[in-house]
């Protein structure tokens, strides 16, 4: 989203890795990822092997973009905003605005009812006036959202790593990062790296 940051990143990577073909894209990630997928499936791109680092702005990444990549010869590292994104949209009482619910649907690739069934439960309390129902958010929704996203990745990629957990200086979980691939060895290496950094 920030042109200056993208230019600086491009400059830094070219200086650090002058022999590598590294491309920094500062555009709508969904458009670019679908274009990349189409190219990798084309005659010009089908013999290429790509490693993509996906660091979406907020929750702008759409599930359809991940599905498109799963068909190509690509390994992806994806930063999933479980604490800073998904969890913040999930209101404790289950009253999520239509806008936020639509964003969750597009991000997770799930319908509204499925999302609600994962993250909320109906509890009944006995009162003087009989039973009353109320909706409550599941405990540890951040971990739950990471598990759901990991399972979603497994539904389209053959292999998915354990998550690397990124926390704030206060120890709050902000992100879970996964590697997804159709290459078993790539994910085995990713898991070895993740294990080292999660300790």
Model regions and ranges:
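Class I S-adenosyl-L-methionine-dependent methyltransferase catalytic core
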Residues: 1-199
């Amino acid at each position: 989203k920030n042109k200056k940051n993208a230019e600086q990143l491009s400059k830094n990577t070219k200086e650090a890795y002058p022999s590598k073909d590294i491309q920094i894209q500062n555009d709508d990630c969904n458009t670019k990822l679908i274009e990349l997928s189409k190219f990798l499936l084309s005659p010009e791109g089908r013999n290429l092997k790509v490693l993509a680092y996906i660091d979406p702005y907020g929750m702008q990444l759409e599930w359809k973009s991940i599905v498109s990549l799963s068909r190509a010869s690509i390994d992806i590292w994806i930063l999933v905003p479980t604490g800073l994104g998904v969890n913040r949209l999930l209101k404790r009482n289950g009253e999520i605005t239509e806008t936020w619910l639509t964003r969750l649907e597009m991000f997770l690739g799930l319908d509204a009812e499925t999302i609600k069934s994962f993250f909320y439960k109906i509890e009944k309390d006995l009162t003087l006036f009989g039973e009353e129902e109320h909706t409550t958010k599941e405990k540890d929704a951040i971990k739950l959202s990471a598990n759901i996203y990991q399972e979603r990745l497994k539904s389209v990629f053959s292999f998915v790593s354990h998550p690397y957990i990124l926390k704030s200086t206060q120890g709050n979980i902000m992100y879970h990062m996964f590697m997804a691939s159709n290459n078993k060895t790539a994910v085995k290496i990713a898991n070895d790296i993740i294990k080292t950094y999660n300790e």
